[in-house]
């Protein structure tokens, strides 16, 4: 028995691949990885001991491209698919798991050509174009969101690494705010943090700001100009995000699916600012259910005024009829919304098929 994991491009897809690879390793099952030279795949897995072999193809996405660039991307995808077909055959792969993203294309189609069972994890509430096409052909489609289109859909807990559960706690007061710009940085969140920093620090609220490597120097300069650089924690990125989340009492974040469910597992109340240009507005739909259940606050990017933060803080500090702060109630309910061992459930479901 030997698995192939494929897909990625961004941290959200890759974090799922990592969680599944860790579970395969725990169960003593060998796995290889197939991704792309474009995006973050190599950064995550080029030297990863989780895989016996790693392959990266020269491929790019097709969505939001001009006609001629789409043709070129499709050609690269097809070329890589035939290479992937030989690789899967060489390694005698018995199962393929796609975590989505354009880099999943070659190995997914190669699996179908080789008649290898294909399993998909759809991380978002709105399917990407590749997963929409492949879902009816897959053995199973795992997701934490309910879908009604064609395909054998299996509702599972999101495959969040156990460290997020292990560092969870129920919040009781807001002493520390985390601004999470994501691996690629988020200009709107970075500006929101800078605009609110003077008032927050004056009120004695600690700030941790992860701004993304491309924005670090500029953001650092502005904190220095504000005279706040020595009063806040600023990082381009952080290798121990679970510890950072553990210390925070409130978070401001984009609404990529992995971030949403990691924050949920940690019990960290969050203000989500969905990326408005995400395909099919999927970031908004990722948190729609949370918003309906009063488990988060969603602020459209075009409404992101500094006063919004303090409006949310006031609401979180209000008490319900039982005398519990909204902050504490939300924090506790978040931890109940997601079950541990999502990756284990997915792997065991595949093995029992």
From Swiss-Prot:
It is an enzyme of class 2 (transferase). It catalyses: di-trans,octa-cis-undecaprenyl diphospho-N-acetyl-alpha-D-muramoyl-L-alanyl-D-glutamyl-meso-2,6-diaminopimeloyl-D-alanyl-D-alanine + UDP-N-acetyl-alpha-D-glucosamine = di-trans,octa-cis-undecaprenyl diphospho-[N-acetyl-alpha-D-glucosaminyl-(1->4)]-N-acetyl-alpha-D-muramoyl-L-alanyl-D-glutamyl-meso-2,6-diaminopimeloyl-D-alanyl-D-alanine + UDP + H(+). This is UDP-N-acetylglucosamine--N-acetylmuramyl-(pentapeptide) pyrophosphoryl-undecaprenol N-acetylglucosamine transferase. Cell wall formation. Catalyzes the transfer of a GlcNAc subunit on undecaprenyl-pyrophosphoryl-MurNAc-pentapeptide (lipid intermediate I) to form undecaprenyl-pyrophosphoryl-MurNAc-(pentapeptide)GlcNAc (lipid intermediate II). It comes from Helicobacter pylori (strain J99 / ATCC 700824). Its EC number is 2.4.1.227. It is a peripheral membrane protein. NCBIfam families: murG (TIGR01133). Keywords: Cell cycle, Cell division, Cell inner membrane, Cell membrane, Cell shape, Cell wall biogenesis/degradation, Glycosyltransferase, Membrane, Peptidoglycan synthesis, Transferase. One of its GO terms (cellular component) is plasma membrane. UDP-N-acetyl-alpha-D-glucosamine binds at residues 10-12, 124, 183, 283. It is found in: Cell inner membrane. The gene is murG. Belongs to the glycosyltransferase 28 family. MurG subfamily.
């Amino acid at each position: 028995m030997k698995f192939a994991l494929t897909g990625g491009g961004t941290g959200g897809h890759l974090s799922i691949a990592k969680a599944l690879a860790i579970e395969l390793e725990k169960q003593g099952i060998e796995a290889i990885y197939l991704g792309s030279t474009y995006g973050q795949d190599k950064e995550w897995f080029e030297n990863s001991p989780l895989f016996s072999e790693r392959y990266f193809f020269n491929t790019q996405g097709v969505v939001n491209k001009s006609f001629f660039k789409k043709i070129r991307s499709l050609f690269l995808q097809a070329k890589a698919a035939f290479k992937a077909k030989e690789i899967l055959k060489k390694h005698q792969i018995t199962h393929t798991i796609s975590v989505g993203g354009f880099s999943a294309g070659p190995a997914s189609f190669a699996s179908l050509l080789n008649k290898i069972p294909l399993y998909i994890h759809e991380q978002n509430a709105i399917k990407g174009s590749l997963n929409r096409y492949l879902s009816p052909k897959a053995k199973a489609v795992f997701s934490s969101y309910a879908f009604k289109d064609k395909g054998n859909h299996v509702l599972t807990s999101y495959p969040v690494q156990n460290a997020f559960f292990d560092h969870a706690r129920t919040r009781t007061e807001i002493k520390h705010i985390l601004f999470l710009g994501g691996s690629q940085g988020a200009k709107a969140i970075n500006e929101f943090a800078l605009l609110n920093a003077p008032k927050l620090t004056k009120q004695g609220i600690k700030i941790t700001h992860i701004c993304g490597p491309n924005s670090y120097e500029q953001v650092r300069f502005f904190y220095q100009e504000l005279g706040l650089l020595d009063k806040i924690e600023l990082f381009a990125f952080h290798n121990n995000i679970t510890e950072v989340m553990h210390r925070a009492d409130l978070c401001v974040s984009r609404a990529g699916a992995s971030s949403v469910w990691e924050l949920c597992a940690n019990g960290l109340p969050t203000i989500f600012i969905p990326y408005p240009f995400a395909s099919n507005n999927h970031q908004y739909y990722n948190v729609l259910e949370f918003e309906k259940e009063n488990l988060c606050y969603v602020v459209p990017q075009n409404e992101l005024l500094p006063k919004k933060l303090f409006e949310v803080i006031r609401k979180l500090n209000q008490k319900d009829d039982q005398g519990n702060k909204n902050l504490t109630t939300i924090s506790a309910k978040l931890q109940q919304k997601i079950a541990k061992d999502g990756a284990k459930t997915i792997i065991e479901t595949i093995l029992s098929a």
